[in-house]
C-alpha cells in the first residue's frame, strides 16, 4: 500500500514560498499572483501503517515548524514537481534511510515531490510561465497529483546490442563499409 503525506511550513516559516512569490512578481512580472504555498509531498511503500504514522512526525516533518495534511491542498491552481526517473533524490533517500534505522528492518520505497499551490487571477500563459520558471527540465518534471498504486518502477529489459568483431583491425575501407 502507498501512503502519502503533505508537509508545509507553518506561518512565519514559509521562507521558500515567500521567496518564490517575490521571484515570480519581480522576474516574471506576474503581479496578479496573490499567494504561493510550497509543500513537500512524501509517498511511502513497503512500510507498516504504524511506522508510517510514527515517521510523519519524526522523519517527514518537524512538528514545531511544519503542518501536516493527508489531502491535496485546495487552491486555484495546484501542480507538483518530482525528480526525473533515475535522478538522485536526496530527500527521499534520507527519509528511507532514517525509517530503516528506526524500524531496524527493510528500507521502504520513498518518492518525493514539491507541490505548488498558486492563488490569484492567473491566465494560462501566467501558469505556463510559472511552471517553466519552477521546473528545471534537466532534473525534474511535472508530477501527477494522483496517488499511484505502487512506487516500484518496472524497467523494460534492454535489447541485445550487436557487437562488431575485429573492429580494431578494420582499415579505412572496412570502417566505411561498417558505417554504410
Residue ranges and their predicted role:
Residues 1-180:
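Core nucleic-acid recognition elements
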Amino acid at each position: 500500500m502507498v501512503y502519502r503525506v503533505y508537509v508545509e511550513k507553518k506561518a512565519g516559516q514559509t521562507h521558500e514560498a515567500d521567496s518564490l512569490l517575490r521571484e515570480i512578481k519581480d522576474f516574471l512580472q506576474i503581479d496578479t499572483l496573490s499567494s504561493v504555498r510550497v509543500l513537500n509531498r512524501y509517498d511511502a511503500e513497503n512500510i507498516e501503517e504504524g511506522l508510517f504514522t510514527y515517521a510523519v512526525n519524526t522523519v517527514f516533518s518537524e512538528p514545531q515548524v511544519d503542518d501536516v495534511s493527508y489531502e491535496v491542498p485546495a487552491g486555484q491552481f495546484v501542480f507538483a514537481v518530482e525528480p526525473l526517473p533515475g535522478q538522485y533524490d536526496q530527500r527521499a533517500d534520507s527519509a528511507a534511510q532514517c525509517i530503516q534505522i528506526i524500524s531496524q528492518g527493510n528500507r521502504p520505497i520513498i518518492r518525493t515531490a514539491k507541490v505548488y499551490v498558486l492563488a490569484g487571477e492567473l491566465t494560462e500563459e501566467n501558469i505556463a510561465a510559472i511552471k517553466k520558471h519552477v521546473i528545471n527540465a534537466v532534473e525534474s518534471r511535472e508530477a501527477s497529483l494522483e496517488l499511484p498504486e505502487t512506487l516500484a518502477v518496472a524497467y523494460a529489459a534492454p535489447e541485445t546490442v550487436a557487437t562488431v568483431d575485429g573492429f580494431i583491425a578494420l582499415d579505412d575501407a572496412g570502417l566505411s563499409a561498417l558505417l554504410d
